[in-house]
C-alpha cells in the first residue's frame, strides 16, 4: 500500500511542479509551494485512481485531475490552520503556512491554490473534451465552496461546545470532507460519460469514503500522539468539537467505520476482483496513524 501511495504522490508532485514552473513568477509562489509540497499521503488521489482503474481511465488523466484535487485540499488546510479558524501551528510535521509566512500571505496562497485547481482542469495538459472539463470544474467548485468544504468548516466552527445530533454531524462531515471524495469518485464516471444514476452511485460511495476518512482523522486526534500524527492532536476534545467520537464514543465510532467499509465493498461487488485496490485503500484509511 505504501509503495502505491508513494508512486501516486511522486507522480502528482512531478505534475504540480511542472505546472508551477510554467507559471509566471510571483511573490506568492514560495508560500503556495510550502503548503503544497511535499504534501500528504495523496489518499484522495489514490481513491480517484482506484475508481478510475475500475472504469479504465488513462492514468495520466487521473494524475492531472488528482493534482487539481490536491490543490483544493492544500488550500483548505492552509485556511483551516489560521488563527481565526482552528489555530493550528503544526501541519504535516512542520510549521503551518501562516506561521512560516504570516497570516495574510497564507490566506492569499490558499486562495491561489484554490484557483490553480481550476487552471489545471481547464489546461491543455488534460486530454478530455471541453464539455467534460466544464462539468468537472463546476462540480469541483461546488465541492470547494459553501456547499462543500467552506460550508462544512463553517458548521464545524459553529458547532463547537454545543450538543449536536448525529445527522447534523454527518451532514457537516460530508460537506467538510466527503464532498471532495465524492468528486474523486464521480470524476471517472463523468469522463466515461456514464448516466446520471451511475454518476450519483459513485458520488454516494465518495460521500461514505469521506465520512470514513473524517472519522478516522478524528480517531487519530483522539488517540495518536502529535509526534506520530505530524500535527497537534487532542485538540478536538479541548475545543468541544462536534464529532461522531464525542457523540458515540471511541469503540462505537470504529464500529460505524466498519459498517461504512462493509457497505462500500458490497456496493462495489459488481466489479469483482478489480475492486481489491479500493478495498485495500479503505482499510488503510481506517488504520492509519497520521
Per-region residue spans from a language model:
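Mg2+-dependent prenyl diphosphate-binding active-site environment of isoprenoid biosynthetic enzymes
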Residues: 4, 11, 17-268, 276-286
